[in-house]
Regions:
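N-terminal intrinsically disordered/low-complexity leader segments
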Residues: 1-13, 73, 77-81, 197-205, ...
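Amphipathic alpha-helical interaction segments
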Residues: 17, 59, 95, 132, ...
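Helix-turn-helix
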Residues: 17, 25-59, 63
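Alpha-helical structural segments
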Residues: 17-24, 28-29, 59-78, 91, ...
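Short, hydrophobic secondary-structure boundary micro-motifs
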Residues: 35, 112-115, 199-200, 235
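Hydrophobic alpha-helical connector segments
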Residues: 74-122, 129-132
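Amphipathic alpha-helical packing segments from all-alpha helical-bundle domains
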Residues: 119-145, 149-156, 168, 188-197
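Amphipathic C-terminal alpha-helical segment
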Residues: 157-175, 189-212, 224-231
Length: 240
């Protein structure tokens, strides 16, 4: 029966299906579990069947980034009002930041790749899903009235802040992930209170820390330091 099923499954293969299975495998077992052979087994096909959709392991890893940004873009489309955000460019950047955070929460094992893999190739060779989000952000800023230099400054600041916050949040190593006591989970009980009184005093704060609220609050502070574009009302009015 398995031999009869395999050709049928091969016929249903597609790049989105292959990348979706790769994302699911990495979510469950980590990046170290991802091999062409293991992914083929997950899909019920021979390894060679995958090479039509991805030429090898490195390309497959890049495909994880592609799928990650596809998900961000899908989240943004699902929550789109169909035009300019009624509250302006800042509100749209906050909406993008939330979509980025939700995707990072869903796929924390892929997040470090998002911070490094796109930078390893020239801009024009990055996945279309990465370029689509970049274009959207730059278009938001352009419609708001930022000139080219201002748009790039805000874009780079926005991306750096989001990635930095999410990497600290999602990739923090803890002593015991299942431990409910934050002092024990983070290993802070090992620190002498006399030497590190402030760290020890902040232990209760770690228990109810809202990372997304901190990220958005910090983003607002960064954007407050940006000069308002001269055509800000243009974006608010939808360009009319």
């Amino acid at each position: 029966m398995a031999e009869q099923d395999a050709p049928e499954k091969r016929g249903r293969l597609s790049r989105p299906l292959v990348l979706g299975a790769a994302v699911a495998l990495v979510d469950r077992e980590g990046l170290g579990a991802l091999t062409m052979r293991r992914l083929a087994a997950e899909l019920g096909v021979e390894s060679m069947a995958l090479y039509r959709y991805t030429p090898g392991k490195e390309a497959l890893i890049d495909g994880l980034v592609e799928a990650y940004f596809d998900e961000i873009n899908a989240r943004l489309r699902a929550g789109s009002t169909g035009g300019s955000h009624p509250d302006g460019w800042r509100a749209e950047l906050r909406r993008i930041a939330r979509a980025f955070a939700a995707t990072a929460h869903a796929h924390p094992e892929i997040l470090p790749l998002v911070a490094t893999r796109p930078l390893a190739v020239p801009v024009a060779r990055r996945p279309a899903s990465v370029l689509d989000l970049t274009e959207h952000i730059l278009a938001v800023l352009g419609r708001a009235g930022f000139d080219d230099a201002g748009s790039l400054t805000v874009y780079r600041t926005f991306v750096a802040w989001n990635l930095g916050c999410l990497l600290v949040d999602k990739r923090q190593v803890v002593d015991n992930p299942s431990e409910p006591d934050p002092a024990l989970r983070l290993g802070l009980h090992r620190l002498p209170a006399a030497d590190y009184p402030r760290l020890r005093a902040l232990v209760p704060r770690f228990a109810d820390f809202d990372h997304e609220a901190e990220m958005l609050s910090g983003l607002d502070s960064l954007l407050d330091g940006m000069p308002e574009p001269p055509l800000d009302d243009f974006y608010r009015d939808g360009g009319s």
